[in-house]
């Protein structure tokens, strides 16, 4: 009977220890997430609010050395990138269809062999110092092969990337 009590205490001790670990781990995750929100420099927040004063439910993350604001506006997902000096780097608008891109881009894509693939995503990327780029992402049917096609607004294909292994993440370094 005594051994049973010790066993129960032993089990409770380790259960509490595991619970304590999970509790501490979840609190650390919460603190680190809120710490990032506190770390967002005021000048970056101000630069963003100047560009998008009507944006709500903005989520921030750090990527490729930049601060990225993610939000939805007019039923479109928008990512706005700023460098550490609060300078606007680029904006990515997820427009999701060819109907929302310049006609020469849609025509050039439809005339290409890539149009036979499944259309996965369409994004318009704007920059302060570079021309606009339209990125069309396609996927080979019944395959894991994915490609990104980079067009100028006049319909000229600038670049084609196989992103099968990389994923389709767009970041400023792709355009340097």
Where are these regions (language model features)?
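Bacterial Sec-dependent N-terminal signal peptides
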Residues: 1-40, 48
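Interaction-mediating elements
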Residues: 38-176
């Amino acid at each position: 009977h005594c051994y049973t009590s010790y066993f129960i205490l032993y089990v409770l001790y380790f259960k509490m220890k595991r619970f304590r670990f999970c509790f501490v781990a979840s609190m650390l995750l919460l603190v680190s997430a809120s710490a990032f929100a506190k770390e967002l420099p005021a000048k970056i927040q101000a630069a963003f609010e100047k560009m998008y004063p009507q944006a709500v439910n903005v989520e921030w993350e750090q990527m490729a050395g930049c601060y990225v604001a993610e939000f939805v506006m007019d039923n479109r997902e928008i990512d706005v990138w700023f460098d550490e000096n609060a300078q606007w780097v680029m904006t990515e608008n997820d427009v999701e269809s060819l109907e929302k891109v310049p006609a020469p881009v849609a025509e050039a894509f439809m005339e290409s062999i890539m149009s036979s693939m499944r259309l996965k995503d369409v994004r318009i990327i704007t920059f302060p110092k570079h021309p606009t780029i339209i990125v069309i992402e396609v996927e080979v049917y019944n395959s894991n092969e994915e490609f990104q096609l980079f067009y100028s607004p006049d319909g000229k294909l600038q670049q084609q990337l196989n992103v099968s292994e990389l994923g389709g993440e767009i970041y400023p370094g792709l355009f340097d």
